[in-house]
Amino acid sequence: MRLVFAIAAALALSAPPVLAQALERGEVWSLKLGAPIADQPIDFVDHACGSAGGPPSIPLGGWADFKRCRPEESGLREVYFRYDDEREYVARAHHSPAEVERYGGTKTYGFPIVVSALISEDAIVRGLRIVSDPRYDANRDEAYVLKNFITARLGRDNWACEDLPMEEGETAVDGVYIKQRCARSLDGGTRATMWVRHLRKAGQARFDPRSGKQTKNQFESLVRLDLVQP
């Protein structure tokens, strides 16, 4: 797959030591589950109330404003954030295309994502949420492949996966139809739940029925991961 090969090629390129050191930054995996908000990374920006992968809502001044966000059914409050783009600017100044690609935008394993922390009433980060970001056209049709990288990180074994029923009007994308929910327990009782979708919804088609021209982005391809402590 194009994106997988591109990621592998990017990882094979190493930045000059000085640049690599300068570009170290936090990402979603840097969140410390079970730790208070005061101990979380400070190099994230644009905190806001999250919407499960949708656009951010109420702007926040930082982690400390989390109680302005409405609690979910679990009682946790979702706080959206994005990665600081300073590292991207440094990479551009050093004329390092591989590092620009690596540090451009909020990504994991090369996939654009929407990320958030799930915070309890006592200001402890109890979980994280990662959702594919559909706003980026490049390789959007391969967003579902992120599942493979997540299972490699968390462990490929002991996932209980359920194929969800096809709803009326849903169809495959170039012969591929995925609508799945997977879950597993990690050390310490942390629960990982992942939803994977790659399909066309009712009304979406590869070709416009009136003009016969190929449509653009008329499909859904995404991964959502919730990683939550008990």
Q: Model-found features: residue ranges?
A:
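Non-cytosolic coordination micro-motifs
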Residues: 21-68, 86-114, 121-230
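N-terminal signal peptide c-region/cleavage motif recognized by signal peptidases
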Residues: 15-17
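Leucine-enriched alpha-helical scaffold segments used for protein-protein interaction
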Residues: 6-8
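Positively charged n-region of N-terminal signal peptides that target proteins for export
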Residues: 1-4
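Long, compositionally biased
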Residues: 67-84
